[in-house]
From Swiss-Prot:
GO terms for molecular function: ATP binding; pantoate-beta-alanine ligase activity. The keyword Cytoplasm applies. CDD domains: PanC. It comes from Lysinibacillus sphaericus (strain C3-41). Catalyzes the condensation of pantoate with beta-alanine in an ATP-dependent reaction via a pantoyl-adenylate intermediate. This is Pantothenate synthetase. It catalyses: (R)-pantoate + beta-alanine + ATP = (R)-pantothenate + AMP + diphosphate + H(+). Its EC number is 6.3.2.1. Pathway: Cofactor biosynthesis; (R)-pantothenate biosynthesis; (R)-pantothenate from (R)-pantoate and beta-alanine: step 1/1.
Length: 284
């Protein structure tokens, strides 16, 4: 496995792969890899000739009071894990390599970025699109791999791929969970022992809301059940729990067929997200 830190070295490798008519799978990450990331890489390994994993904690997607400086980092560990699942090339640039100049052109994520996580993290998805677009241009992937846990991010990146005519296929891999249902996340390391015991209630709440909505079609009732469960079972603070048409991220209507049930909850100081995407077979 090769590890590269410069754009020049990366693009030379990508051009050689393209000249050899190899398919390229890109797995973008911010590092501190967990089983969810490794599942993305394993899926990419099964479908491509060359698997590229980026490891870059992207400053443009963090707000001024967020955890950019404290975000967990362990590049040697990540490199070993990436190699263990068959990644061919790790691209781990510095901030200066990716953003050599302040200012310049920026991508605006649009209306899809003003709700859910975007409501409490203004500018977050602009930063996500900025780095993902750069990675797409640099790696020229045949396929790009993302996790369902970041469902809003996936929807917004899919819109960018469509609108900017990126010639690639989006691959979305299901959420990987702990045995008690908690979605795997690099931020789970922040949780204290007692907070970790409470955190699975988020997934439980989404299951309750999903069952309620499928039984009654009542959005308010479903969300109320989810909120009540979190309030009873945890000391957490709810950022949002919403039920929307997916991938449009618009209000549910009688013709909605696919639904996103998404939550963000602060357990202690740690903001955790989770979701469920499911089909309403006959519409509402």
């Amino acid at each position: 496995m090769k590890v590269m830190t410069t754009i020049q070295a990366l693009t030379a490798e990508i051009q050689a792969a393209k000249q050899a008519h190899k398919t390229i799978g890109l797995v973008p990450t911010m590092g501190y890899l967990h089983e969810g990331h490794l599942t993305l890489a394993q899926t990419a390994r099964a479908e491509n000739d060359l698997v590229v994993m980026s490891i870059f904690v992207n400053p443009t997607q963090f707000g001024p009071n967020e955890d950019f400086e404290s975000y967990p980092r362990d590049l040697p560990r990540d490199i070993a894990l990436a190699e263990s699942v068959g990644v061919d090339l790790v691209f781990a640039p510095s901030v200066e390599e990716m953003y050599p100049q302040d200012g310049g052109i920026r991508i605006h994520a649009g209306e899809q970025a003003t709700i859910l996580c975007g409501a409490s993290r203004p500018g977050h998805f602009d930063g996500v699109l900025q780095v993902v677009a750069k990675l797409f241009h640099l790696t020229l992937p045949t396929r790009a791999y993302f996790g369902q846990k970041d469902a809003q991010q996936v929807a917004i990146i899919t819109t960018m791929v469509r609108d900017f005519n990126f010639p690639l296929d989006m691959r979305v891999v299901p959420i990987v969970r702990e045995e008690d249902g908690l979605a795997k996340s690099s931020r789970n390391i922040y949780l204290s022992e007692s907070e970790r015991e409470e955190a699975p209630a988020i997934h439980e709440a989404l299951q309750l809301a999903r069952d309620s909505f499928l039984a009654t079609g009542d959005v308010r009732e479903a969300l109320a059940k989810a909120k009540a469960h979190i309030q009873i079972q945890t000391h957490g603070r709810i950022d949002y729990i919403e039920l929307l048409a997916y991938p449009d991220l618009t209000p549910v209507t009688e013709t909605t067929q696919q639904v996103l049930l998404a939550a963000a909850v602060y357990i202690g100081k740690t903001r955790l997200i989770d979701n469920s995407i499911f089909t309403v077979k006959e519409g509402l």
